[in-house]
Amino acid sequence: MSQQRTARRQPSLLVDPAQETVRRRCRDPINVENLLPSKIRINLEENVQYVSMRKALKVKRPRFDVSLVYLTRKFMDLVRSAPGGILDLNKVATKLGVRKRRVYDITNVLDGIELVEKKSKNHIRWIGSDLNNFGAAPQQKKLQAELSDLSAMEDALDELIKDCAQQLLELTDDKENERLAYVTYQDIHGIQAFHEQIVIAVKAPEETRLDVPAPREDSITVHIRSTKGPIDVYLCEVEQNHSNGKTNDGIGASPSKSSHPQCPEKEDEPPQ
């Protein structure tokens, strides 16, 4: 009998307690019927919860969350929002979730460079520059002001362009103005920019296409194409102001023998 007990295998230290309990109960023929699946499941679930709880206790905060740089940034945020720059160090330690010793590490450095002063044992006051304008150099402020002025000017120009476009649309769509949509030779002659220039007036229907290729040294080519009617082209010779009748290029300018187009009658279609 003693030999049978000695030959019995001792449970290993690495065996799960829940599994060993099940194994021992299974060896006893009397308790096999009383062993229910629910009991096995309960034991396993309790074991898993125990292991998960142990792992949760071992979780540590990230190193960056407790670093001095991170705490200093949070401390400066509290200084920026504090009335009068006065802080209670006990409340600071509570908000930062660290020991008061870590807060003293920050305040001692700031006190050494004369950015804070101690009001009492647990209170300090910020005496440095205004944190709301921290980092805003004068040049940056100047550029921001110029940018604001340019933005306002751009908005004003956009409104003017929009207003001019609306007025032009109303002018061209008005039936009363359609019969007066023409210019005379005297109108062209009165424009100073057209003096000593060759002016060509084109009267064409809607959707006429005009292409001007890159000009050459001695000539300019213009292509006009229309699919809705004929195209009328007028050469408007602007008179020269020189008494000798010569242009700036030294070429003689003879007066035009053709009659200049005058103001058309109402029934005629005016040139565009």
Swiss-Prot record:
Region span, Disordered: 242-272
Molecular function via GO: DNA binding; DNA-binding transcription factor activity; DNA-binding transcription repressor activity, RNA polymerase II-specific; protein dimerization activity; RNA polymerase II cis-regulatory region sequence-specific DNA binding; sequence-specific DNA binding
UniProt-listed GO biological process terms: regulation of transcription by RNA polymerase II
Coiled coil: none
Keywords assigned by UniProt, alphabetized: Cell cycle, DNA-binding, Nucleus, Repressor, Transcription, Transcription regulation
Cysteine-cysteine disulfides: none
Region described as Leucine-zipper: spans on this chain: 143-164
DNA-binding residues: 50-129
Presence of the UniProt keyword Repressor in the record: yes
Span(s) of short sequence motif DEF box: 95-129
Top-rank taxon: Eukaryota
UniProt-annotated stretches for the region Dimerization: 130-222
Pfam families for the chain: E2F_CC-MB, E2F_TDP
Spans annotated as Transcription repression: 173-272
Renumbered residue ranges of the record's region Binding to corepressors: 1-62
Protein localization: Nucleus
Any one cellular-component term (Gene Ontology): MLL1 complex
Physiological role: Inhibitor of E2F-dependent transcription. Binds DNA cooperatively with DP proteins through the E2 recognition site, 5'-TTTC[CG]CGC-3'. Has a preference for the 5'-TTTCCCGC-3' E2F recognition site. E2F6 lacks the transcriptional activation and pocket protein binding domains. Appears to regulate a subset of E2F-dependent genes whose products are required for entry into the cell cycle but not for normal cell cycle progression. Represses expression of some meiosis-specific genes, including SLC25A31/ANT4.
Family indicated by similarity: Belongs to the E2F/DP family.
Assembly: Forms heterodimers with DP family members TFDP1 or TFDP2. Component of the DRTF1/E2F transcription factor complex. Part of the E2F6.com-1 complex in G0 phase composed of E2F6, MGA, MAX, TFDP1, CBX3, BAT8, EUHMTASE1, RING1, RNF2, MBLR, L3MBTL2 and YAF2. Component of some MLL1/MLL complex, at least composed of the core components KMT2A/MLL1, ASH2L, HCFC1/HCF1, WDR5 and RBBP5, as well as the facultative components BACC1, CHD8, E2F6, HSP70, INO80C, KANSL1, LAS1L, MAX, MCRS1, MGA, KAT8/MOF, PELP1, PHF20, PRP31, RING2, RUVB1/TIP49A, RUVB2/TIP49B, SENP3, TAF1, TAF4, TAF6, TAF7, TAF9 and TEX10.
Listed name of the protein: Transcription factor E2F6
Organism whose genome encodes this protein: Mus musculus (Mouse)
Gene: E2f6
